């Protein structure tokens, strides 16, 4: 991608707070017009990146580049980058209209221009009827919309959102996710969003940056992150995962290997390179696994085991299976399986203790080295 297609870049950026390393040698390119999410647990460095982009922090080393220009020492008010904070930071004594127009007023814009742009911003977030209200008379979701309107009214190059849904209830969070994504498409500007919620990141983003302990673990589309995790950390962080321990026993061709997994021979597919005898970890999402009744065994290789638990979740059923152990006296591996619920399918009504055969959809496995990479 050409350099001019990036609105923001971090090049070799590290950030220290006293002796604590918050970010370590970060390289990140943010594309014009994309919805990018920084995803990770508390303390991983995602908010520090946001503060570097906004200008509230400066890097200890490396460069922050905005539209091709190094902006390490450029203050926030000169970057044309706006931030929506967790607490919304609305002025309680001002009306909604005055809150949204505050930045334009500070820029000494003409009154008629302020009125027009505030009106357009409020219409964009469906609050045109609430201009005369004070923040205290608004719901949490409405306050958030005001904060967003105030941020976009200045026509920023980039809008930064720091876990803005954290104070909202579940249904309102879901609604706001759709509204924010629609708004981003409508405006056509770059949104950089911070969250620890994987579902939130996947629902809204063009690309996701998975972070851990001040480092970037993987960058990719939601589908790439979920289906092709770069390592065990990413696989575990973005959803439920089953991990089978195994050994490569032979190579059939460029992508197909024979392996022994939990004591059972299986073929596995991977683009990674392995040698005979290499220890591996095979990763399977719960929805990739298939269960078979013992009176209807599948062709090819399969595990055997027993149902331990079933959990009804409405659209799906979670099924816990204990595999038969390859070693006498040792418990077998426990697997989590997810199946779509069908009340007319008698075979999905498993009972604890029931024997089953276990397979998966060929090619959907992820094979990593024994070190989890």
From Swiss-Prot:
Pfam families according to UniProt = ABC_tran, TOBE_2
- EC assignment: the record states 7.6.2.11
Where along this sequence does the record place binding of ATP?
Answer: 40-47
Q: Does the keyword Ribosomal protein apply?
A: no
Per UniProt, residues of the ABC transporter domain are 8-238
State the family named in the UniProt similarity comment for this chain: Belongs to the ABC transporter superfamily. Spermidine/putrescine importer (TC 3.A.1.11.1) family.
Q: Report what the protein is called.
A: Spermidine/putrescine import ATP-binding protein PotA
Q: Which organism is it from?
A: Oleidesulfovibrio alaskensis (strain ATCC BAA-1058 / DSM 17464 / G20)
Gene name tied to this protein: potA
